[in-house]
């Protein structure tokens, strides 16, 4: 590995991608941007290429590639433009890359994230859907390739920091009783249940504590985000669903906790800023400045905790059930949720319909065994088709 680490940022124009580039720019002596990818914000992607001068940039189609390549040449930049999933996999597994930030949202991030894992890279995992969809296959690839997998979700990063280094021996073996996964409760934590039928995409995207993209903001409002994180935590830390308890913590200061059999509870605290887990994972096992302000406990004053209400947040229940069933159920849950959230953002369904659509899809057929990646994508395809049927009837 060279002194300056070469970083590929998949999903560079999103919230996580931009935060990653902010941290990288603070440490030019340690990190350089090897490749960037973007999907729809091509003007922003061009600006990032000018700022960071990557070797490669990946865009979704030939038309976007032609336009961007022309702009980059006009700016006298040597950056080469690649296209589509093949391009994403190429920059994720490239021989000169040391570390990959996997921050593409949704199922689209699975193949390039797996490409990074199979190439044995240090993978900073922000794409939770990769593990939700293909958990057993994904973790098997990590073990076989020798890749280093570091979680970026603030909750999983917190759990990682609170566990001993040898937690791979098993949670019981290292004395863990349970993992406490914190959740803010989102913008609808106290909204009267009857009003949830009428909330708008703008209200759902107005998170009280975190700055996030639209899809993850809606997932946070429905608490599907926490459900997906529960499934992800099961795979990352080899935990059973019943070992993970979700706790509403409205201040988003404690990012998660680990409860040990001797009565000790370790927690990781910090301001709600994704640059903290990003900097932790980039530098691990060392520490670097992230640009995040120090935590002011006196300004916070108090920390509150409550149990989640599954009547208010049925998506959390559906995710836990999918985790318990296993097989293709988590992939179908994720696909149905992606369709439902997109329909809600387009104002085609109500917020409360998100859980209804997902439950319909999960009840429409029994979960199947998932022994190869093709089975994962088939489950994803079936779930999207079923979700489309539900949409057509409502």
Swiss-Prot record:
- Residues bound to Mn(2+) are 153, 155, 229
Q: Domain of life here?
A: Bacteria
Recorded catalytic reaction(s): these are: 2-C-methyl-D-erythritol 4-phosphate + NADP(+) = 1-deoxy-D-xylulose 5-phosphate + NADPH + H(+)
Required co-factors: Mg(2+); Mn(2+)
Entry EC number(s): 1.1.1.267
Binding site residues for NADPH: 13-16, 127, 129, 213
* Record GO terms (molecular function): 1-deoxy-D-xylulose-5-phosphate reductoisomerase activity; manganese ion binding; NADPH binding
Record keywords: Isoprene biosynthesis, Manganese, Metal-binding, NADP, Oxidoreductase
Annotated NCBIfam families: Dxr, PRK05447.1-1, PRK12464.1
Instruction: Write down what this protein is called.
Output: 1-deoxy-D-xylulose 5-phosphate reductoisomerase
Q: Please give the organism.
A: Ectopseudomonas mendocina (strain ymp) (Pseudomonas mendocina)
Identify the gene encoding this protein. dxr
């Amino acid at each position: 590995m060279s002194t300056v680490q070469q970083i590929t940022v998949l999903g560079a124009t999103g919230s996580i991608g931009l935060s990653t580039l902010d941290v990288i720019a603070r440490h030019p002596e340690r990190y350089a941007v090897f490749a960037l990818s973007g999907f729809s914000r091509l003007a922003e992607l061009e600006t990032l290429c000018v700022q960071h001068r990557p070797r490669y940039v990946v865009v979704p189609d030939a038309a976007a590639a032609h336009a961007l390549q022309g702009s980059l040449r006009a700016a006298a930049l040597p950056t080469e433009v690649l296209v589509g999933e093949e391009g994403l996999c190429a920059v994720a597994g490239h021989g000169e890359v040391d570390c990959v930030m996997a921050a593409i949202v949704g199922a689209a991030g699975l193949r390039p994230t797996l490409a990074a894992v199979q190439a044995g890279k240090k993978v900073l995992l922000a794409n939770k859907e990769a593990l939700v969809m293909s958990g057993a296959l994904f973790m098997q690839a990590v073990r076989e390739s020798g890749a280093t997998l570091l979680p970026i979700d603030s909750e999983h990063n917190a759990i990682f920091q609170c566990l001993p280094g040898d937690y791979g021996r098993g949670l019981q073996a290292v004395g863990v009783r349970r993992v406490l996964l914190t959740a803010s409760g989102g913008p609808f934590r106290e909204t009267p249940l009857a009003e949830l039928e009428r909330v708008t995409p703008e209200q759902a995207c107005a998170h009280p504590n975190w700055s996030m993209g639209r899809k993850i903001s809606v997932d946070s409002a429905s608490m599907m985000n926490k459900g997906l994180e529960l499934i992800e935590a099961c795979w990352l830390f080899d935990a059973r669903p019943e070992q993970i308890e979700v706790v509403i913590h409205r201040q988003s200061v404690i990012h998660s906790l680990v409860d040990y059999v001797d009565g000790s509870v370790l927690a990781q605290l910090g301001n709600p800023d994704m640059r903290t887990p990003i900097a932790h994972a980039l530098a691990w096992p060392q520490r670097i400045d992230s640009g995040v302000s120090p935590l002011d406990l006196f300004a916070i004053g108090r920390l509150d905790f409550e149990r989640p209400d599954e009547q208010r947040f049925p998506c959390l229940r559906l995710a836990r059930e999918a985790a318990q069933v296993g097989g293709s159920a988590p992939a179908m849950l994720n696909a149905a949720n992606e369709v439902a959230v997109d329909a809600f953002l387009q104002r085609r369904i109500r917020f409360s319909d998100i859980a209804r659509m997902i439950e319909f899809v999960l009840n429409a057929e029994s979960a199947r065994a998932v022994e190869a990646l093709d089975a994962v994508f088939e489950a994803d395809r079936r779930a999207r088709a079923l979700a489309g049927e539900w949409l057509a009837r409502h």
